[in-house]
Amino acid sequence: MSDSNSTFKDLGVAKWLAEALNSMKITQPTTIQKACIPEILAGRDCIGGAKTGSGKTIAFAAPMLTKWSADPCGMFGIVLTPTRELAMQIAEQFTALGSVMNIRVALVVGGEDIVSQALELQRKPHFIIATPGRLAHHIMHSGEDTIGGLKRVRYLVLDEADILLTDTFSDALATCVQILPPKEKRQNLLFTATMTDQVLALKDAPPTSGKPPLFSFHVENLDDLAVPASLQTTYLLVPEHVKEAYLYQVLSSEEYKSKSAIVFVNRTISAEILRRMLMQLEIRVTSLHSQMPQRERTNSLQRFRANAARVLIATDVASRGLDIPAVQLVVNYDIPANPDTYIHRAGRTARAGRGGEALSFIAPKDVSRIQAIEERIGKKMDEFTKVGDTALIRKSLNKVTVAKRESLMAMDKEGFGERRKTQRSKGKQTKSLHS
């Protein structure tokens, strides 16, 4: 690996790109960048592992852009990622880095107009940043003039590869990959924050004939996924029927009323109920979940980044990768089934040595999950004592109950949830057509 004082130019990055990075105040390569950039430039397939915020995007973007600038023609590379927000963020970075070279970047994600995307693909963008489901839709339904360029791409990147290699994405991913050049004729780059069995299986696969050996690198202690030492991990035993009242009491308490927070839930309907309820209770709140139209999701993120909202209610779409400023409090309103998900959520606070707190609401059914999390992070959670006065909870319970009831009535009137049923129905019909 390159020495600790390496510059991007030392790593082999094109002069124009090193200057572009410098203008963005990115001057010192991170560990993952120093390890992977020279190897990718040398033509090796790569598996790179590092925690969120370690610079993984530039680790694959810099060598791809360097090679592209030497021969800037046609569709050059595809980056697949599991969420729309991550895709948008990566597309923004590619566009910013390549703007001096007139780069063309296409964003192909759900929630946006399909016809406009098809027209954009026909214009042969240099790089396509996509979610697998939407790109697979174009491959199955668009003409050769739209997707023909995919057959000649030189790079395939799977970002957040551990998620993309799960069953959730397997069908769409297979559709995307089958139209690309065979693996012998393209470079395959996988980046992840978690080394799962599926990722390790690819690492240990037999070498591809005619290609240099696979390069695999992960930043030390990645597999430990240890939570930062500056993070307080706390729990609060909360009866299920008064969880909303406890959440309101925490967020509006003297201790937390001016602090930024992300509240993680397991279901989209919970995110929507809590957003509406807290808004009625005059807390500056926004939300992020898969049932929101794309424009609303983008606006919601922008509001939270700009501190127009101090509380973000989110499903796990917000736990990884997204460029969200570090917050002071993470609340696990619902406990995740996977301990690693807890770690990714908690990673939204206590960054860069700063303090932070991850508070988990625990109902009796969650005890086994908490034990698994404590075993995974190697430490016991402390009991949360800052808020929890039962008299105060009882006092706020009535207005919280009213706010929740009014929120549910409004959602029912608007048909919230019907959209999801329609989407599921369409998905089943589409799947049956292609089965």
Curated annotation (Swiss-Prot):
One record GO biological process: endonucleolytic cleavage to generate mature 5'-end of SSU-rRNA from (SSU-rRNA, 5.8S rRNA, LSU-rRNA)
Positions annotated to bind ATP: A50, K51, T52, G53, S54, G55, K56, T57
Domain annotation Helicase C-terminal: ranges: 246-393
GO cellular component assignments: nucleolus; nucleus; small-subunit processome
This enzyme's EC code(s): 3.6.4.13
PROSITE patterns per UniProt: HELICASE_ATP_BIND_1, HELICASE_CTER, Q_MOTIF
Name of one Pfam family that matches: DEAD
Sequence motif: DEAD box, positions: 159-162
Residue ranges with Basic and acidic residues bias: 411-420
Recorded superkingdom: Eukaryota
Disulfide-linked positions: none
Enzyme class: hydrolase
Start and end residues of each Helicase ATP-binding domain: 37-213
Region (Disordered): 411-435
Keywords: ATP-binding, Helicase, Hydrolase, Nucleotide-binding, Nucleus, Ribosome biogenesis, RNA-binding, rRNA processing
Catalysed transformations (reactions): ATP + H2O = ADP + phosphate + H(+)
Motif Q motif, chain ranges: 6-34
General function of this protein: ATP-binding RNA helicase involved in 40S ribosomal subunit biogenesis and is required for the normal formation of 18S rRNAs through pre-rRNA processing at A0, A1 and A2 sites. Required for vegetative growth.
Written domain comment of the UniProt record: The Q motif is unique to and characteristic of the DEAD box family of RNA helicases and controls ATP binding and hydrolysis.
Family recorded in the similarity comment: Belongs to the DEAD box helicase family. DDX49/DBP8 subfamily.
Name recorded for this polypeptide: ATP-dependent RNA helicase DBP8
The species this protein was found in: Eremothecium gossypii (strain ATCC 10895 / CBS 109.51 / FGSC 9923 / NRRL Y-1056) (Yeast)
Upper taxonomic lineage: Eukaryota, Fungi, Dikarya, Ascomycota, Saccharomycotina
